[in-house]
From Swiss-Prot:
Protein known as: Phosphoglycerate kinase, chromosomal
Subcellular location: Cytoplasm
Residue numbers binding ATP: 218, 340, 366-369
The family this protein is said to belong to: Belongs to the phosphoglycerate kinase family.
Subunit structure: Monomer.
Top EC group: transferase
Keywords: ATP-binding, Calvin cycle, Cytoplasm, Kinase, Nucleotide-binding, Transferase
GO molecular function terms attached to this record: ADP binding; ATP binding; phosphoglycerate kinase activity
Lineage of origin: Bacteria, Pseudomonadati, Pseudomonadota, Betaproteobacteria, Burkholderiales
EC number: 2.7.2.3
InterPro entries xrefs: Phosphoglycerate_kinase, Phosphoglycerate_kinase_CS, Phosphoglycerate_kinase_N, Phosphoglycerate_kinase_sf
Gene: cbbKC
Pathway membership: Carbohydrate biosynthesis; Calvin cycle
Length: 413
């Protein structure tokens, strides 16, 4: 297991390296201790609730298994989706996660609801899954009262959820202030180490793929990357907004016209540095958004008023693939089309294959990105797969992540 103290990253250096679970395990003494693990089990699900990619669940297993082997009484929780606080919601239950975790651990993992007040016992060497932490009132606002209640449940708090490290919530930040011992799990430590080493002095050209439905959710990151990367490939609704900014028609496609000035500014910043935001030359359109919609490839100048752009076209995909194959470092967050529907998945498939074939060091993160990697079977040909989404991108941007900061503060105290 890698220590946070060995990481070289763009973040401000903390006063002290956070304690790690690895160090606690090496020292012994976890036997009989109550260990509370905040994992990131926020996995994608289909309409029926079935898990479509279990990467994050599998990534959580090493910390859980190590604590069980050490004889600890283990409690694990995570968020799943965005349920309303204080209102149990079967649609956001961790039950499917619990079933998969049971299979991976080879033992039954009971699911407990209403757990914040305690009143339950976990025998040493056993594990329970605590229902979706975002159902607890005060979780998202980092309630001090809730944090203290949760801290009272444990002797050791372990944060093994890099994917939520950018959020100051009760299970990622508050509890770490009050638990008797607070430390970083192996996944969290490994994420920071790998990402930091990759970004210390990245091999050039540095190419980033940032895709998603809205520019607004990734505007700060896009602006930051505009100062760093050599090519900024945009996809999804984000690409539509950039196409509008470039004076192209996008029909009735998802876009944010109020952010055209920001998109143009990013294009200009890149151009002044001799870098680029490649704009699609062809796209795949449909008249409706559905799994059965007919797909039509069109040059960008031929997009009709009633068209929806749902993928990049084959010429654009080939052009971007060449950039990826020539890259020194690749950062990937987000599929470039509606890859869940096969007729709009070619762009993502071509870029995924190019990343797999590139000699560049590649790092990829984000739930949909993990699903695309799994779908195309390239996991063993991506340099490092991060289980973080927003945290992954904010780390790349160099922001201080609250969950890491509080662990560093505890270590320094």
């Amino acid at each position: 297991m890698m220590s946070l103290s060995h990481a070289t990253n763009p973040q401000p250096k903390p006063a002290a390296a956070p304690h790690t679970l690895a160090a606690l395990l090496a020292a012994g003494g976890l036997a009989g201790k109550r260990v509370f693990i905040r994992a990131d089990l926020n996995v994608p699900q289909d309409a029926a609730g079935a898990i479509t990619d279990d990467t994050r669940i599998r990534a959580s297993v090493p910390a859980i298994a190590a604590c069980l082997q050490a004889g600890a009484a283990v409690m694990v929780t995570s968020h799943l989706g965005r349920p309303q606080e204080g209102a149990p919601d079967p649609r956001h239950s961790l039950a499917p996660v619990g079933r998969r975790l049971s299979e991976l651990l080879g033992r039954q993992v009971p699911l407990l609801s209403g757990w914040t007040e305690g009143g339950f016992q976990v025998p040493p060497g056993q594990v329970v899954l605590l229902e979706n932490c975002r159902m607890n009132t005060g979780e998202k606002k980092n309630s001090d009262e809730l944090a203290q209640k949760m801290a009272a449940l444990c002797d050791v708090y372990v944060n093994d959820a890099f994917g939520t490290a950018h959020r100051a919530e009760a299970t990622t930040h508050g509890i770490a202030r009050y638990a008797p011992i607070a430390c970083a799990g192996p996944l969290l430590a490994a994420e920071i180490d790998a990402l930091g080493k990759a970004l210390g002095q990245p091999a050039r050209p540095l190419v980033a793929i940032v895709a998603g439905s809205k520019v607004s959710t990734k505007l700060t990151i896009l602006k930051s990357l505009a100062d760093k990367v050599d090519n900024l490939i945009v996809g999804g609704g984000i690409a539509n907004t950039f196409m509008l900014a470039a004076g192209l028609k996008i029909g009735k496609s998802l876009a944010e016209p109020d952010l055209l000035a920001d998109a143009r500014a990013i294009i200009d910043i890149m151009a002044r540095r001799g870098a680029s935001v490649p704009i699609p030359v062809d796209v795949v359109c449909a008249k409706e958004f559905s799994a059965t919609a007919a797909a039509t490839v069109k040059d960008v100048k031929d997009v009709a008023d009633d068209d929806m752009i749902l993928d990049i076209g084959p010429k654009t995909a080939a052009m971007l693939a060449e950039q990826l194959k020539a890259a020194g470092t690749i950062v990937w967050n987000g599929p470039v089309g509606v890859f869940e529907f096969d007729q709009f998945g070619n762009g993502t498939r071509v870029l995924a294959q190019a990343i797999a074939e590139s000699k560049a060091f590649s790092i990829a993160g984000g739930g949909d990105t993990l699903a695309a990697i799994a779908k195309h079977g390239i996991a063993d040909r991506v340099g490092y797969i991060s289980t973080g989404g927003g945290a992954f991108l904010e780390f790349l941007e160099g922001k201080t992540l609250p969950a890491l900061a509080v662990l560093a503060q505890r270590a320094a105290a």
